Amino acid sequence: MKKVMKIIGIVLLCIAALVVVLIVVNTIKTAINNKRVWIPDDYYTAFESDSALEKKYAGLGEYEVKELEFESENKSIDKIRVWYPNEAEDRQYPVILVVNASNTAAINLKPVYARLASWGFVVVGNDDRQTGTGETASETLDYVLNLNKDENSELFGKMDEEHIGCVGYSQGGAGAINAVTRFENSDKFTVLFTGSASYALLSKNMGWEYDVSKINIPYFMTAGTGSSDDAGNSDIHSNEVKEFPGVAPLASLVENYDGITADVFKIRARVTGAEHEQMLQKTDGYMTAWMLYHLQGDTEAASVFVGENADILTNNGWQDVEKNK
């Protein structure tokens, strides 16, 4: 009997050791993956659209881009990363702050930031993977604007502080809404874009509650029609629903759109066939156009959104479009 118990003990010990090894290996693999770039540098070459304008703005701009990184004292932020046009010319560029989706960091999507900066923007991100409250976005904005005033900084005088956009995806969509509405520096932002921002009740349950009625800057909100964004269950106000309605159902976009006052330029639209995880790349073109229009005064980019003949209204890749300008 003692021999049997001894064998059982050895087996249990081996199983426990194996579990520990698997946990350690998985932790190491996760840590390595978290520091990897997840998409190729030329990811934008795969973008497809029937709209010449959307395809144009999903590509590269005219500027060569330089990247800088800064260590943050905030462990959640980890590193602040900045991409900007690498020109000898002494001039300022509009700023775009990107708020990460869940479990995503700027380091994982470097080509996305670099592509956007090539259109003449200072693009700012950080490595926070839980961004929904908007706090780290607000802190990151303060940090880079201080660099803009620091004569010893490589970024001294490069940022146009009168033109600052905020872009957020998924959880980061909630974070972007909070960034432009909840903080002392929220009034620095002049334009907002979100891709599949998590619906209001989901955000509240997760601790990222937002209030769209406080938005007073132009806002372009998007989502996908795929089941991960909209599962067809329109009940977004009850925690008792048996089926998850998706991260950003159409009902959520309608509610958020209607919750913003009519004097604010607002657009809601969905990417036909897009699943939640595809939204960052699927919206690249029109997100860039939205920023060019509002931050650089680009009239061609404005034609994507403004008027009865706006490009977005005739683009078969988009549906459920509602706008007030």
Where are the regions a protein language model picked out?
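N-terminal Sec-pathway targeting helices
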Residues: 1-20
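Short amphipathic alpha-helix adjacent to the substrate-entry channel of hydrolases
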Residues: 107-126
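N-terminal cap/lid segment of alpha/beta-hydrolase-fold proteins
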Residues: 35-91
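Hydrolases whose catalytic domains are alpha/beta-hydrolase-1, hotdog thioesterase
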Residues: 175-179, 203
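Gly/Ser-rich "nucleophile elbow"/oxyanion-hole loop immediately N-terminal to the catalytic nucleophile
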Residues: 87-92, 135-174, 182-183
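Alpha/beta-hydrolase-fold serine-hydrolase catalytic core, especially in secreted/extracellular enzymes
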Residues: 2, 29, 33, 271-325
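The feature captures the conserved acid-bearing segment of alpha/beta-hydrolase catalytic domains
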Residues: 190-279
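Short beta-strand element of the alpha/beta-hydrolase
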Residues: 91-101
